[in-house]
Amino acid sequence: YKEDIVTIHYESTFQVQRALDYLVPYGCKRFLAINPATPIGQIEEVLDYIDGVNLLMVNPGFAGQKIVPSTLRKAEKLQKFLQEMHREDIILEVDGNITKEHGATLRSFGASIFVAGTSSIFCTDVSHFGEKIREFRKAVE
C-alpha cells in the first residue's frame, strides 16, 4: 500500500525530521504543512527531508474561514525563500479559502497544488460540480 503524498503538520510534533524520516520506506512524497503564523525560516532545517510545503491560508480546524490576509504575502516570501535556498524543486501547495481569485494570485507565487473546497468548488447542486472544477482550473492555469 502506497500513498502519493503524506503531509506532516510542522506544529504537530517536536520531532519533525524524525516524522518525515519515518515515511521514507513508503516511497511517498513528504509534505510539511505550516500554519499561517509559523515563520517560514522554521522549515529551513528540514528542507532536505521534504518534497513539498502545504501553506495553510487559514487557521486549521474550521471550514469556511476567510483567508488570513498576510498569507498571500507569505506565499510570495516562501517562493523567494525556496529560490534563495536553491530549492525550487519543492512543491508549493496551498489550503484554505482558495477562491478562483486567490488561486490565480497564489499560482503567480509558485503554487501548483490547490486544496479546493467550500470557497471554490463545493456546491449544493452536484450537477454543477464539474463546471465548478473547470472554472477553477481555468482560473489557476
Segments predicted by a language model, with ranges:
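Conserved anion-binding
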Residues: 1-91
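Active-site-proximal glycine-rich helix-loop-beta segment
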Residues: 2, 110, 117
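Conserved strand-to-helix beginnings and helix N-cap segments that scaffold or border functional pockets
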Residues: 17, 68, 104, 126-130
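Catalytic cores of alpha/beta
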Residues: 38-50, 96-114
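Conserved, mostly hydrophobic/aromatic
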Residues: 53, 78, 95, 106, ...
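Short Gly/Pro-enriched loop/turn and capping motifs at secondary-structure junctions
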Residues: 60-61, 97-101, 120-121
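C-terminal helical cap(s) of enzyme catalytic domains, especially alpha/beta-barrels
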Residues: 107, 121-141
